[in-house]
Amino acid sequence: MSLGLIGRKVGMTRLFTDEGEAIPVTVIDVSDNRVAQIKTQATNGYDAIQLAHGTRRATRVTKAMAGHFAKAGVMAGNALNEFHLDAAKIAEMTPGQVIPAETAFTAGQKVDVQGVTIGKGYAGTIKRYHFASGRASHGNSRSHNVPGSIGMAQDPGRVFPGKRMTGHLGDITRTVQNLVIARIDAERNLIMVKGAIPGAPGGKVIVTPAVKTPLKKK
């Protein structure tokens, strides 16, 4: 149970260390994370806070959501997410409170980043699963990109579940674990993590403290 933030992927750049080493980082904008609702054990059966992120006109959300934001006294957002917290931490928060980046995270901390991967549409097995293509010549006729056999004969007489075939590629939720925060820009509420994260620039991401930190090698 730890506090996370909703962010927007800005893009990638690089940072330089004092030794001159270039570090590729992804910039995440976590500004305007505001408390939209506080849930407690007494009223909801569990302890959590609901954060809103982004801005949206009240006329562009449903009446139910417009009332939900108005009750908390916050501007309508385009993203909502819950984070389970201890009752002691929730007691310190109030609806409408803005949570800055340095409150939730510190430089050098490991985090998990969840996002939706870039959709590639309907793709073949070569692009989707990195299958090898067929021969370009020497008797190969119109079978350059076919996947090959998809099963056996009359026994078992079916295609096994999970067989890798053509289909939709991308546009699924993925989480990258144990990314290190290289720097936090407190003035602009930006988090810079080492490496790449899922999604296209401008996409919604959720940043949470790492839950499965790897063991140190002896």
From Swiss-Prot:
Q: Does the keyword Ribonucleoprotein apply?
A: yes
Output the Gene3D superfamilies linked to this UniProt entry. 3.30.160.810, Translation factors
Q: Which GO terms describe its biological process?
A: translation
Does the keyword section mention Cell cycle?
no
Annotated region (Disordered), positions in chain: 134-154
Posttranslational mods: Methylated by PrmB.
Q: What is the organism field in this record?
A: Polynucleobacter necessarius subsp. necessarius (strain STIR1)
Which HAMAP family does UniProt cross-reference here?
A: Ribosomal_uL3_B
Q: InterPro entries, from UniProt?
A: Ribosomal_uL3 (IPR000597), Ribosomal_uL3_bac/org-type (IPR019927), Ribosomal_uL3_CS (IPR019926), Transl_B-barrel_sf (IPR009000)
Residue spans making up a coiled coil are: none
A single Gene Ontology MF term assigned here is: rRNA binding
Q: What is this protein called?
A: Large ribosomal subunit protein uL3
Which Gene Ontology cellular-component terms appear in the entry? Answer: cytosolic large ribosomal subunit
**Oligomeric form and interacting partners:** Part of the 50S ribosomal subunit. Forms a cluster with proteins L14 and L19.
Residues modified as N5-methylglutamine are Q154
Entries under Pfam families matching the protein: Ribosomal_L3 (PF00297)
> What role does this protein play?
One of the primary rRNA binding proteins, it binds directly near the 3'-end of the 23S rRNA, where it nucleates assembly of the 50S subunit.
Q: Which UniProt keywords apply?
A: Methylation, Ribonucleoprotein, Ribosomal protein, RNA-binding, rRNA-binding
**Family recorded in the similarity comment:** Belongs to the universal ribosomal protein uL3 family.
